[in-house]
């Protein structure tokens, strides 16, 4: 029987009926500071959590103030982090837009006038937000004696500090959600194409989520699970770091030192999330099959196939290094393998194919689909999944 490697994205948790969309988190933050219910208050007390530090987070404040102008992007925190970090870098490189030449300090009217000239530029909202925040902090924190570069570096450090707080707040939300779903409501797995996977509890799991939903609902084992982006753990010892990776893609070959702390690969190194998932692909198991030789059955040792099922992941190029490594190791393993990408609808399928073309290259993708090493199945199509699973 073939082995299974599950690669799970947030769409998996959503398919299981969990409120893990970024929009759910953003609504939770509003609820937390305006009208928290008694159950939430008791949860925070039990976990000894003080929420004052998380109020008016710069990233969530930006989203709430600019939601109408941002289109669909407002609902993706990672896009917002990317845009704001780029805006900080832009302001660092263009300090004349922020400082009055006459007084060498920021004047709000002049900043607004300068920024208004950029209204048609990409990422205008983020640039204006960072510029006006700089104006406020400059006088609140008495930066008059600082050189321009030093003052702008302090703004960058504030955004990095706020990113850490945002990650902590996300951990609080997901931990509370775990409590509601698994201790209070005791939810069960919803029907999906994964129902076709036999012995799913014994699967290896490459988990891009911070939650262990597959463990709760399918009984997958933690020792066979790699939380590649870290995991929630409010009960960790005080000397242990938050391992959750939450950031942006490294878009350039040349390392931009200012953007490094925002990038996922950097956070994976700092938080030591490791490369345990590679073992799932490297490990080769054998089974014995009878082969007919001169009219008689001869036991022969053959490699066990691997079904690599990607469920609820957009295959965003943010995670391209991980997917490239998965494909590379599967090929090196010399066992029969098949990547089975599930999709919610045709629009999502097209997006996954586009992302795979970016990650693998067009020719390689055509080759793999031609060999049936890559196939696509609708996420609710159990029969379709049964048809494509390697035996």
Located regions from the model:
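Active-site catalytic pocket residues across diverse enzymes, especially alpha/beta-hydrolases
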Residues: 29, 218-221, 330
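Extended, H/D-rich, highly charged conserved domains that either
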Residues: 39-283
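Extended, charge-rich low-complexity interaction segments
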Residues: 255-291, 365-391
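Extended amphipathic alpha-helical scaffold segments
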Residues: 68, 288-293, 309, 358
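A conditional alpha-helix N-cap/helix-loop micro-motif detector
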Residues: 186-187, 207, 287-291, 316-319
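SIR2/sirtuin-family catalytic core signature
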Residues: 1-25, 41-47, 296-391
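Active-site-surrounding "flap" and adjacent substrate/cofactor-binding loops of secreted or lumenal enzymes
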Residues: 27-41
């Amino acid at each position: 029987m073939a082995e299974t490697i599950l690669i799970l994205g947030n769409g998996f948790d959503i398919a299981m009926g969990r409120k893990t969309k970024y929009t759910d988190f953003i609504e939770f933050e509003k609820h937390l500071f305006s009208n928290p219910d008694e159950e939430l208050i008791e949860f925070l007390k039990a976990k000894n959590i003080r929420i004052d530090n998380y109020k008016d987070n710069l990233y969530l404040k930006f989203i709430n103030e600019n939601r109408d102008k941002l289109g669909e992007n407002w609902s993706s925190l990672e896009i917002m982090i990317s845009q704001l970090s780029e805006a900080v870098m832009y302001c660092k490189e263009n300090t004349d837009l922020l400082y009055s030449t006459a007084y060498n300090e920021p004047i709000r009217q002049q900043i607004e006038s300068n920024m208004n000239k950029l209204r048609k530029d990409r990422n205008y909202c983020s640039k204006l937000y960072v510029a006006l925040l700089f104006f406020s902090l400059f006088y609140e924190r008495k930066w008059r004696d600082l050189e321009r570069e030093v003052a702008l570096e302090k703004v960058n450090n504030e955004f990095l500090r706020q990113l850490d707080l945002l990650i902590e707040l996300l951990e609080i939300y997901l931990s509370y959600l775990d409590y509601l779903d698994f201790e209070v409501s005791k939810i069960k797995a919803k029907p999906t194409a994964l129902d076709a996977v036999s012995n799913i509890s014994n699967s290896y799991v490459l988990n891009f989520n911070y939650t262990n939903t597959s463990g709760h609902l399918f009984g997958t084992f933690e020792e066979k699970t790699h939380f590649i982006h870290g995991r929630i753990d409010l009960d960790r010892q005080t000397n242990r770091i938050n391992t959750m990776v939450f950031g942006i893609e490294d878009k350039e070959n040349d390392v931009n030192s200012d953007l490094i702390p925002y990038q996922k690969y950097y956070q994976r190194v700092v938080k030591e999330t490791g490369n345990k998932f590679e073992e799932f692909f490297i490990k080769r198991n054998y089974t014995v099959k009878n082969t007919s030789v001169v009219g008689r059955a001869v036991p022969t040792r053959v490699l066990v196939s691997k079904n690599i099922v990607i469920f609820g992941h957009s295959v965003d190029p943010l995670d391209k290094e991980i997917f490239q490594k998965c494909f590379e190791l599967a090929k090196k393993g010399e066992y029969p393998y098949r990547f089975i990408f599930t999709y919610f609808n045709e629009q999502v399928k097209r997006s996954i194919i586009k992302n795979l073309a970016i990650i693998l290259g067009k020719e390689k993708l055509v080759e793999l689909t031609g060999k049936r090493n890559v196939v696509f199945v609708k996420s609710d199509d159990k029969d379709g999944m049964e048809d494509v699973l390697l035996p």
